[in-house]
Amino acid sequence: MRYYSTILAALILACSFTLGVNQAAAQSNEANVSAPLSGPVIQRIRDKQTLTIAYDPNQSPFSLTGDDGLPTGYTVDLCKIVASQLVTQLDMKLMDVRWIKTNTRSRFDAIESGEADLECSASSNTLDRQRQFAFSLTTFIQGATFAVRNDANLEKLDHLTDKKLAVVRNTTTSKLMKQAIASGQMQATLIEAKSFEAAGNMLANKEVDAIAGDRLLMFDQIIRSKLGTRFRMLPQDFAPEYYAIMMSKTDPEFRWAVNATLSRTYRTPVIGELYQRWFGSLNQPGQLMEALYFTQAYPE
């Protein structure tokens, strides 16, 4: 709790600073003259007249396949807004949008190989990943925690010592857990699962004592599942997760175009409507998320 209070205090301070910048910008009458955007990813999109977006259909409510067979979700909807603005930003008359399905491993390959221009799921922005990929403005913040069985005498993080823990492979939570165990910060046996569904089955069958993962992903994919009535989540979070849209590092101007659309969207009621659509039944946006949107709504 102290950690999140510190973050909140810093963001509120940043809010005050940003408000001052916005007011100053509003008083400025300087013309905004921009050169045409260019770069390798932008050129690829222009040449193909197509924006290719990767998404993981197993990361609801951030990315999933809807009943109509089309991609949907909180991050997917943000990327649809980005796509709608790219036509104008790149001065194109026509641009198709192509969606490809990926998973927790192939999403990185899709961006690195150039098969996809954007990755729109629930990808965490970390310092390690920034060495290989570029990330947009932060789109969501949440904490990682543990899901346990209702009948288990496990109430807090300390109770997980010497227990068997499941985690979805190729995720930041998996990496964090491996580091914590290797450094001696946590004593536990880690078992990797291919998905939250597989991890949920392990927990139900008592093959593991808990599942580690991002809180909202676990709530949506485990607690809401047919096995969900048998599980609960611990109240404590052990790590923050900062989600963002992932893309190639080779094109800073493409990243700027994505960020410009996100920042402008954060100024409007649209972002609140998206939040309510995908998370309204789970929780209301707290001060942390409100500050996140406010501090990234940069002036022109």
Spans of features found by a protein language model:
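Extended ligand-binding regions for polar small-molecule ligands
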Residues: 27-42, 77-85, 151-154, 158-164, ...
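Bilobed "Venus flytrap"/periplasmic-binding protein-like clamshell domains
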Residues: 55-61, 71-88, 124, 142-196, ...
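Periplasmic-binding protein-like
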Residues: 57, 140-151, 215, 223-263, ...
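Short helix-initiation/N-cap motifs at beta->coil->alpha
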Residues: 38, 92-109, 152, 190-202, ...
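Ligand-binding clefts/hinges and TM-proximal coupling segments of bilobed small-molecule sensing domains
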Residues: 28-36, 175-191, 229-231, 262-300
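A ligand-binding cleft/hinge motif common to bilobed small-molecule-binding domains
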Residues: 106, 120-132, 176-183, 204-239
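Acidic, polar ligand-binding/catalytic clefts
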Residues: 80, 84, 91-159, 298-300
